[in-house]
Amino acid sequence: MRFERLAQDGQARRGRLSFPRGTVETPAFMPVGTYGTVKGMTPQSVKDIGAEIILGNTFHLWLRPGTEVIETHGDLHDFAQWDKPILTDSGGFQVFSLGDMRKITEEGVHFRSPVDGAKVFMGPEESMAVQRSLGSDIVMIFDECTPYPATEAEAKRSMEMSLRWAERSRIAHGDSPSALFGIIQGGMYPELRERSLKGLLDIGFDGLAIGGLSVGEPKEEMLKVLDYLPGWMPDDKPRYLMGVGKPEDLVEGVRRGVDMFDCVMPTRNARNGYLFTAEGTVKIRNAQHRYSTQALEADCDCHTCQHFSRSYLHHLDRCGEMLGAMLNTIHNLRYYQRVMAGLRTAIEAGTLTAFVEDFYARRGMPVPPLAA
């Protein structure tokens, strides 16, 4: 992987990630393909909305269908028929989301499979082995996602174990040609975040991710972390904000120097009839759309807006038709890609401030201040 910085406007960066399977223009949003598929989308339709990289879930693909099945095809690219880059998360977040079903030790995590109840173990070495089998272009280290809220002592213990697991992940990654990203933890505590970052830099990674956000904390707390943390990170490595989020969160992350994002929000909200537009969120199942012959968004170039009315989308949603979820997903993912393209163009032109002001004005929202 090669990362180039092409332009900068304030703290916001315009860059490019290059892989043998293709390039990714940054800032970039990665659609989430948990089971090797972006829900409701074919691989071609994911390309059509402008995505250049997708995210796969190590934990879920390991449990089902299993690496043995995927390896019979080659790797995840061959299995899912996606010939562009793939980032795989390590499985850590999903393991720690199991609550009482898991037991954390220094070695890793013992848990019962949510698929069949079998006893399973995953540690850094297992996670790296699975991601190697998947043929991931970007591999994430195995870490513990610090919960919110957490005391400073709890966040410190978690962060220190994640650093030890990061070193084991680095060793287990070995001579793999895939890029390996470290994950900064430390909860809401700047000193712990700084220690985590320094520890990861000492180990050495191709990119760095900000973990432990979008885990239930107020948005103000998230922005506090983003106000200082990206600025501490090296200029020559890509910066990835994990699991975030709303369109406004992407804009705020980019303003603070983040390069990469992923979130299930555009696909999950689409399946529930919540559609993103420049003027805000449209709840398509509301009765006001029943007779509307207008497109969902007049200036949107997605297949949904180019061919179907709000009335038809409303009808599909009320009937629970799968086409409704598919058309909604096409629009939401295209909307996210259009926001990212707008941010890239604005950074190149040095007009990010004007872009941000217009973005919030169309929503009737004030522009959140940046830290001095």
Swiss-Prot record:
Keywords: Glycosyltransferase, Metal-binding, Queuosine biosynthesis, Transferase, tRNA processing, Zinc. Binds 1 zinc ion per subunit. The keyword Nucleotide-binding does not apply. Zn(2+) binds at C300, C302, C305, H331. It catalyses: 7-aminomethyl-7-carbaguanine + guanosine(34) in tRNA = 7-aminomethyl-7-carbaguanosine(34) in tRNA + guanine. Transmembrane segments: none annotated. Its cofactor is Zn(2+). Pathway: tRNA modification; tRNA-queuosine biosynthesis. It comes from the Bacteria. InterPro entries: ArchSynthase1/Queuine_TRR, TGT, TGT-like_sf, tRNA_ribo_trans-like. Belongs to the queuine tRNA-ribosyltransferase family. PANTHER family: QUEUINE TRNA-RIBOSYLTRANSFERASE (PTHR46499:SF1). Catalyzes the base-exchange of a guanine (G) residue with the queuine precursor 7-aminomethyl-7-deazaguanine (PreQ1) at position 34 (anticodon wobble position) in tRNAs with GU(N) anticodons (tRNA-Asp, -Asn, -His and -Tyr). Catalysis occurs through a double-displacement mechanism. The nucleophile active site attacks the C1' of nucleotide 34 to detach the guanine base from the RNA, forming a covalent enzyme-RNA intermediate. The proton acceptor active site deprotonates the incoming PreQ1, allowing a nucleophilic attack on the C1' of the ribose to form the product. This is Queuine tRNA-ribosyltransferase. It comes from Chromohalobacter salexigens (strain ATCC BAA-138 / DSM 3043 / CIP 106854 / NCIMB 13768 / 1H11). The gene is tgt.
